Amino acid sequence: MPKRVLQGVVVSDKNDKTVVVKVERRYSHPLLKKTVRQSKKYKAHDESNQFKIGDQIFIQESKPISKDKRWIVVKDSVA
């Protein structure tokens, strides 16, 4: 099974080698019949501390790195 890749925005880089990424998804609400935006935050491993707040990045699923981290930063979405 391939590993999931998500795109999001860095909202926090205060932790060492960790960034918090906000991933937004859109779906059609079954009752209201309108598009709804929903976001979720993921902690991702950033080995070199190169990503800053506001950066658009891709994160990939990985084995557990710590209690909360199960994602690693793959690349910058601009590159």
Curated annotation (Swiss-Prot):
Role of this protein: One of the primary rRNA binding proteins, it binds specifically to the 5'-end of 16S ribosomal RNA.
Origin superkingdom: Bacteria
Oligomer status and interactors: Part of the 30S ribosomal subunit.
Record-linked PANTHER family: 40S RIBOSOMAL PROTEIN S11 FAMILY MEMBER, SMALL RIBOSOMAL SUBUNIT PROTEIN US17M
Keywords: Ribonucleoprotein, Ribosomal protein, RNA-binding, rRNA-binding
Keyword RNA-binding appears in the UniProt entry: yes
Family annotation (PROSITE patterns): RIBOSOMAL_S17
Protein name per UniProt: Small ribosomal subunit protein uS17
Gene from which the chain derives: rpsQ
Gene3D superfamilies for the chain: Nucleic acid-binding proteins (2.40.50.140)
Single GO cellular component term: cytosolic small ribosomal subunit
Gene Ontology molecular function: any one: structural constituent of ribosome
InterPro entries per UniProt: NA-bd_OB-fold (IPR012340), Ribosomal_uS17 (IPR000266), Ribosomal_uS17_bact/chlr (IPR019984), Ribosomal_uS17_CS (IPR019979)
GO BP, sorted A to Z: translation
Organism phylogeny: Bacteria, Pseudomonadati, Pseudomonadota, Alphaproteobacteria, Hyphomicrobiales
Pfam families reported in the protein's UniProt record: Ribosomal_S17
Family: Belongs to the universal ribosomal protein uS17 family.
